[in-house]
Amino acid sequence: MMLVQLRQVGVIRSPYKNFSKAPHQGRFSKETVEIEIFPEFEDGLKDIETCTHLIVLYWLDRANRDALLVVPPHDSREHGVFATRSPHRPNPIGFAVVELLERDGRVLKVKGLDALDGTPVVDIKPYSSTIDSVGNAKIGWFEEANPQSKLTRLLLRAKEFHGHICPFVALGVRMSVIAMEKLGVEEDAMASVGEDILAIVECNNCLTDGVQVATGCTLGNNSLIYLDLGKNALTIVRRKDWKGVRVYVNAENVRKYFSKEALELFNKVIVRREGSEEDAKRLSEFWEETGWKMLEIPEEEFKVEFVEVQPIERAPIFENKRCEKCGELAMATRVKDGLCLRCAGSYYAVVGRGIVKFDGEMREVV
């Protein structure tokens, strides 16, 4: 057996002094933690400030190295350490993806690290959402023991897609899962790509982004249908029998889960457009907290009904035609009398408030 030697490259300065004070996962830590790199390794930090997120590997020096079976915090059953994230393991190497807030010489200020104060640092690497992120990754026993973890995983994916967590992107995730479970539809990306299931949304707000992430149904794969009805509602349909489940949420009813300060900031920052940068940042924090709450509100807050939908044709393949004015190719169905719709001066677009008519210069036609 090979003897592996590691060199400590730095140390973590953390507000967490013992296991009981640290969060179960660094991702849920809101504290700023400092990573001090030793002088002889300072050159290794060149260009690190260009990275937004880092992978930090550290040595869990207070762990039990004899453990091979553990009972994790979110399950009552025993599991092998290699199937868990337990700090107690033969080679206790900790792993965290952190946000780099600032570099000050040899000190990196980060957020998202749950390591204890004084923990040795083994290595640091840049994190890439393109290379490192696996959107459909699961821990089977964990999701079995914690049904809520599926919603958590989907909402974190929705955050990457939507840009932030807010109440209605979370409601889109929650409503999608409710509809799919009621319909007996498994989470399967190929089902949406093959148009075996369709998602019919009745709004074009944040909720729709949550639906796209949770169902895999998008405009681009022709499995998302938008009805310009202005309702917070979603229908998931099986193409094989056109049976579906429609889920509706009353926005007025869920407002009781919003804090008074969050609502006041929303009106100031979003409705009146009067907020400062600090107001916007504070609203974002409130919105994320409220978004997580939306995953836990009673299912009775949602109106759920089984429906049947009239058959909808699969997306056909159309030939292209060349516009006689601009010379560009356009779908044949969008060329009238030799002109593309833009050159003809009349077409429709989806904007923030729904479907509107534009002229050739993208001016709204009233």
Swiss-Prot record:
Pfam families to which the protein is assigned, alphabetical: FmdE, TrmO_N
- At the top level, the lineage of the source is Archaea
Please report the stretch or stretches of sequence annotated as the TsaA-like domain.
Answer: 6-136
Q: Does the keyword Disulfide bond apply?
A: no
Supply the alphabetized keyword list: S-adenosyl-L-methionine
Q: Where does S-adenosyl-L-methionine bind?
A: 23-25, 61-62, 85, 116-119
- Matching SUPFAM superfamilies, A to Z? FwdE-like, YaeB-like
Does the record carry S-adenosyl-L-methionine as a key word? yes
Family according to the record: Belongs to the tRNA methyltransferase O family.
NCBIfam families xrefs: tRNA_TsaA (TIGR00104)
Q: What is this protein called?
A: Probable S-adenosyl-L-methionine-binding protein AF_0433
Q: Which organism is it from?
A: Archaeoglobus fulgidus (strain ATCC 49558 / DSM 4304 / JCM 9628 / NBRC 100126 / VC-16)
